[in-house]
Amino acid sequence: MKSLLLMMTFFTRIPVTYPYDYDEKDFIKGVKFLPVIGLLIGILMYLPTLLAPYIHRPIIIVSIWALYFLITGGLHIDGLADTFDGIFSYRSKEEMLRIMKDSRIGAFGVLGILWLLILNLTLAYYTENMLLLLVPVVGRASAVFAASRTIYARSEGMGGAFIESCRTKEGVISIAFSLLLGSMVSIKGAIIPMGITFLGVAMLTKKISKILGGMTGDTIGATIEISQTLFMLSAYLLKSIII
């Protein structure tokens, strides 16, 4: 329970009390709970869909993502912006890492956020409500999976504790948890898009690690956001074209 509460304080803005002193061992134990945090976020995001009989779907979709950003505090989308600014600067590895640490947002960061919002709002409109519940689960499982396949790119920083705590075991547990939940919703509609997403995450992690020499807290945040969009896109394409 300590580890779960610790993860909630780190990765959400949900007002929970953590009455313990910080212990790195609790953090290490807690990384495997990140998909569980994703499920909690998903349940909260699902609540606006209960108003479907009374409110038009576009308003519900906007409410879902507004709630998502309130719950996460925009933490991961900030990482996406920093990652875009750094990588698309096409500078040296050291310069990219410096740019990503800069609190100011650049043109590529703004474009990244805009494209992500457009895609998320559009895809969510066509995504079944139960699959929307799984979106944050997939995102956080992807974070653990990505971290388990790389090293930390900086010499110090908050992201290092997370990445160094994720090993193959944690990656497998996170994926298995996601697939288990997905199987309860839809084998075709959830499991196949999850498989496509995790494959995409593996490729993305390899590419970023090659560019930066590893991953950072920002690129893990970017991975969460990109994987969520990829999951919805895969589900949409499978539903409309193949299945």
From Swiss-Prot:
GO biological process: cobalamin biosynthetic process
EC number of this enzyme: 2.7.8.26
Cofactor: Mg(2+)
Protein's UniProt keywords contain Cell division: no
Taxonomic superkingdom: Bacteria
Keyword rRNA processing carried by entry: no
Compartments, record wording: Cell membrane
Pathway: Cofactor biosynthesis; adenosylcobalamin biosynthesis; adenosylcobalamin from cob(II)yrinate a,c-diamide: step 7/7
Pfam families: CobS (PF02654)
One GO MF term attached to the UniProt entry: cobalamin 5'-phosphate synthase activity
Key words of the record: Cell membrane, Cobalamin biosynthesis, Magnesium, Membrane, Transferase, Transmembrane, Transmembrane helix
UniProt membrane topology term: Multi-pass membrane protein
One annotated Gene Ontology cellular component of this protein: plasma membrane
Enzyme class: transferase
Family indicated by similarity: Belongs to the CobS family.
NCBIfam families: cobS (TIGR00317)
Name this polypeptide is given: Adenosylcobinamide-GDP ribazoletransferase
Organism per entry: Alkaliphilus oremlandii (strain OhILAs)
Lineage: Bacteria, Bacillati, Bacillota, Clostridia, Peptostreptococcales
Gene: cobS
